[in-house]
Amino acid sequence: DGRPVDSIQAGDEAIVILDRTPFYGESGGQVGDTGELHGLDIRFAVADTQKLAGQFHGHSGRLEAGVLRRGDTVSGSVDAARRAATVLNHSATHLLHGALRGLLGTHVAQKGSLVAPDRLRFDFSHFQPVTAEELAEIERRVNSEVRANHPVVIREMGMQEAMDAGAIALFGEKYGERVRVVAMGESVELCGGTHVGRTGEIGLFKLVSEGGVSAGVRRVEALTGQAALDHVAQEERRLREAAGLLGGTTADVADKLKALLERQKRLEREIELHKAKAASGATADLVERAVDIDGVKVVAARLEGLDAKALRDATDRLRQQLGSAVVVLAGASDGKVALVAGVSGTAMGRIKAGELVGFVAGRIGGKGGGRPDMAQGGGQDGPGLQAVLAEVPSWVGSKLSPG
């Protein structure tokens, strides 16, 4: 609860403050260290480390054993594997920043970052999405710096001397008269974080995502070291699986997929042609079956195998062929019904397509609406559909002769 105490018991959660510590406190985007504090019969599990008031380190965690009192002497044991993975990502972040500025322009400025053991995230100013080609070049440049195995040189110097040396400072960050400068290859930045000894220790750098955060701010995420290798291996497994499904090798996945998509488009065109022919054949029969009510031809029918588009085409064709007409067509699939209604000629103004489709849809558990001359709707398939379609001529008659 934030109150200072003189001691804690096993099972208590607390923030322990030490006069000095090997733990890194979260700062500059780099997450705080985890590990353990040990003393005589004392074991405190550190889940996070934060900087307090800019100078103290707060070790957050839980006392697993013993009684920890104010003034006790303890030793710290940092989770070395977690720190090592975090270090790779922090040094890679510096190389990434340099590659972004080198390729996209010096307007690129850091707007936020996360340096964690499992990944790195970098937010930066840029006016448009980074293209796939640009991302590939950025990744290539960073890996080139990794392979160059540059030594990472860390020095403390005066702020003006650092600026004269070309060091990049973070906008809005507060610095003292003495600053810590981290240089690796062409990258020179002010930084208080932990880093590799040489860039080659990063092993591999792999970009995994790019997107927008806000207006003028982009975000990239990346992996390094073993995490990057694991990601590449997973992508290769997926590629092999895709190749197997396509009946080819990883080298011809793109060609196989392109051929499959072209075949799908061709089949879709053939299906549309078949539907058009079916609609054309159906309309010829429906013209003969149209009912004449006060000089208006009325057609209400169910057509098998036609979707909403085919129903619209058939309705348009019937309106053209019948002149003054009221048409409502239904197509059923998987228990669902698509409805299209159309009105033309002298029926216009007296019959509204939206009202007609609403009448039919309402009887089959659905709804619909649209323009006075053309409307759409839907509902559930069942015996009620044929029954309501049979009532359409009388419904039209009541509208044409309301008295």
Predicted regions located by residue number:
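A glycine- and charged-residue-rich anion-binding loop/surface
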Residues: 1-403
